[in-house]
A protein has these predicted regions:
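Surface-exposed binding patches on compact interaction domains or structured appendages
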Residues: 55-57, 111-143
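Short acidic/proline- and small/hydrophobic-mixed sequence motifs that coincide with surface turns
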Residues: 99, 110-115, 160, 176-177
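Short, solvent-exposed loop/turn segments enriched in Ser/Thr/Gly
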Residues: 86, 95-103, 144-146, 156-164
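Short, acidic/polar linear motifs in exposed loop/turn regions
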Residues: 108-111, 155
Length: 189
């Protein structure tokens, strides 16, 4: 075999190796993509085995909404309003989904109160979401309403989050008070 023929044979073998490596890489990429899509469409699961359940809703940012994971705990009261829970500890929350922790606000006083626009204090993390009042914002004695807080993070916003929610309460006589709620979570894939 001449030197020219030998080099041509080496080029054919190199071409075959390159083709085989490219095909193997493409198959691996397709497999990883299918796995990621399957995890995303099922709601995903954490490393600890927690299964997340979709609500069937899509958030304002176009992300699937999951049932709020974690633990709701405690009760906090002021002169005229009681909030349950006082804290949402969400645990690990996947990226690119939305969760909506919700608090029940109950007028325990003797006069009507008005729930004002909540303000978020970021203790750690970033990017608070929108609040939604699910019910009336003016509560007669003994009346409840729900306050929900939509949270969704994407890559670059991941990591631990700690937020305090200051909810202003105005009385019929014009006096005000604030009830402080909290939400904690670790947003990551």
């Amino acid at each position: 075999m001449s030197n020219t023929q030998h080099r041509a044979e080496e080029r054919r073998h190199a071409h075959r190796r390159t083709w085989l490596l490219t095909a193997a890489a493409a198959i691996a990429l397709v497999g990883a993509s299918v796995g990621a899509i399957a995890a995303a469409t099922s709601g995903g699961s954490s490393a600890s085995g927690t299964n997340y359940k979709r609500t069937g809703e899509i958030s304002a940012m176009g992300m699937p909404v999951l049932e709020t994971p974690g633990t709701a705990s405690g009760t906090i009261s002021t002169e005229s309003v009681m909030a349950t829970p006082s804290t949402w500890a969400l645990g690990r929350v996947p990226l690119n989904v939305a969760v909506r922790p919700t608090w029940l606000l109950h007028n325990t006083g003797t006069d009507a109160i008005t729930i004002g626009e909540p303000h978020v204090q970021i203790n750690q993390g970033c990017c608070p979401g929108a609040f939604t009042m699910q019910g009336p914002s003016t509560l007669d004695p003994g009346v409840d309403t729900n306050l929900s807080f939509e949270l969704s993070m994407h890559p670059g916003m991941d990591g631990p989050h700690d937020m305090t929610i200051h909810v202003p309460v105005q009385h019929a006589d014009g006096t005000t008070e604030t009830i402080n709620l909290s939400v904690l979570g670790n947003f990551s894939d």
